[in-house]
Amino acid sequence: GSGKSTLFKLICGLYQPSEGTVRIFGRAPESIPEEERRKVFGLVEQQFKPVSGNMRDQITLSDPSIFEKDVRRALAETGILPAIEDLPEGLDTPYDPGLLSQGQFQLLSIARATVTNPPLLLLDEITANLDSVTEKQVLDALRAASVKRTVLSISHRLFEAAGGRQVRIGH
């Protein structure tokens, strides 16, 4: 490849550069404490990665410092709040992979990434496995989530549809 995923791993502090430096808001990413990283950047990956617990835990990752109002704001911002409220126990519904469609889980991923209101949003092929109707829903949610944030995206199609400045790396 051309290093797109490596670039994200450098930004997230998972890799250290062999030459030069990486700075996120003036700080080396690897120096940002784990508990603070979600407040600096939100990461949305191609596949939703569930955690044990209920639907609230899927957003908060069991972080007690995240308030209910923040969870609801993130869900409303992405348009997935009505679907969550329709679940038998709402946010308290135990996680099950059959509860939502693949596209709805991508919306949940965006809510997870934005619940702490980070200034940087990293998107890794988030529309790659979606049909065109679901892709439009995800892109609409992304437009809302992108307000007042810097967005870096690895995608073959995303910014063509979403509108935005492009920096191309590789093919």
Residue ranges and their predicted role:
Residues 2-3:
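Walker A (P-loop) phosphate-binding loop of ABC-type ATPase nucleotide-binding domains
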Residues 12:
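Helix-to-loop junction immediately C-terminal to a conserved catalytic motif
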Residues 20-28, 37:
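Conserved ABC transporter NBD signature motif
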Residues 48-94:
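Conserved "ABC signature" C-loop
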Residues 117:
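Conserved catalytic motifs of ABC-family nucleotide-binding domains
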Residues 121-125:
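Catalytic Walker B motif of ABC-type/P-loop ATPase nucleotide-binding domains
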Residues 141-155, 159-163:
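Conserved catalytic loops of ABC-family nucleotide-binding domains
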